[in-house]
C-alpha cells in the first residue's frame, strides 16, 4: 500500500498521468518496502490526511531505482489499474478484525507498507 495526500497528488492526478515515479520517500522502512516490490505487484492507493481511504489499485511497472530527487533513496514506477468501486475508509479498516495487524493501523505514519495477500483481498472485498 502507498499513501498520498490527495491535495498534493490524488488518485485522479495519478490516473491522468498514466504512471508516476513514487519519489520522495524518506523513511528507511518505507524505502525497504519500495525495494521489495517487483514488477507486476498490485499496490493499494490510499488517500491520507483528507479522506483517509483506500481509493484504487496500482501496479508496479518499474522496480526500485535511485530516487532522482535524492539518489541515496529509492523510487518505483507505479501505474493505475482501476479505482475501487467503493472507497474503504480507515474507520472501516480499523473496525475489521481481519485487518487488526495491518501496518496502516499499527504504524500509521508509514507511507509505503506491505500487505499480506489476505489483507489485500479483505480490503478489496470491503470495496464491493
Kindly give the residue locations of the regions a language model identified.
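Short beta-strand-centered aromatic/proline hotspots
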Residues: 53-63
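Contiguous surface segments at macromolecular interaction interfaces
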Residues: 1-6, 67-128
Amino acid at each position: 500500500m502507498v499513501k498520498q495526500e490527495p491535495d498534493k497528488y490524488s488518485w485522479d492526478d495519478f490516473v491522468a498521468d498514466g504512471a508516476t515515479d513514487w519519489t520522495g520517500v524518506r523513511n528507511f522502512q518505507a524505502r525497504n518496502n519500495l525495494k521489495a516490490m517487483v514488477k507486476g505487484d498490485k499496490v493499494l492507493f490510499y488517500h491520507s490526511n483528507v479522506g483517509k481511504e483506500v481509493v484504487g489499485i496500482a501496479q508496479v511497472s518499474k522496480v526500485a531505482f535511485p530516487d532522482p530527487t535524492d539518489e541515496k533513496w529509492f523510487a518505483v514506477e507505479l501505474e493505475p489499474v482501476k479505482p475501487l468501486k467503493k472507497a474503504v475508509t480507515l474507520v472501516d479498516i480499523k473496525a475489521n478484525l481481519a485487518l487488526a495487524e495491518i501496518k496502516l493501523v499499527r504504524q500509521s505514519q508509514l507511507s509505503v507498507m506491505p500487505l499480506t495477500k489476505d489483507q489485500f483481498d479483505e480490503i478489496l472485498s470491503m470495496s464491493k
